[in-house]
From Swiss-Prot:
It comes from Solanum lycopersicum (Tomato). The lineage of its organism: Eukaryota, Viridiplantae, Streptophyta, Embryophyta, Tracheophyta. This is Large ribosomal subunit protein eL37. The keyword Zinc-finger applies. Its cofactor is Zn(2+). The keyword Protein biosynthesis does not apply. GO terms for molecular function: RNA binding; rRNA binding; structural constituent of ribosome; zinc ion binding.
């Protein structure tokens, strides 16, 4: 009744530490990670979203 690799339809994924190599094959990062890829970048700015940057003052770096 369930998948022998991932135990679907069980709620949690099937994983065993006695097979380290198998874990490595299917851990996070072996796929696209559509969502997780961008998390570190968003974490750096405290997950701020949809705000506009404050306007810089006129003669900041150009006056050298």
């Amino acid at each position: 009744g369930r998948c022998s690799a991932c135990a679907y339809p069980a709620a949690r994924l099937r994983k065993y530490n006695w097979s380290v190599k198998a874990l490595r094959r299917k851990t996070t990062g072996t796929g696209r990670m559509r969502y997780l890829r961008n998390v570190p970048r968003r974490f750096k700015t405290n997950f701020r979203e949809g705000t506009e940057a404050a306007p810089r003052k006129k003669g900041t770096a150009a006056a050298s």
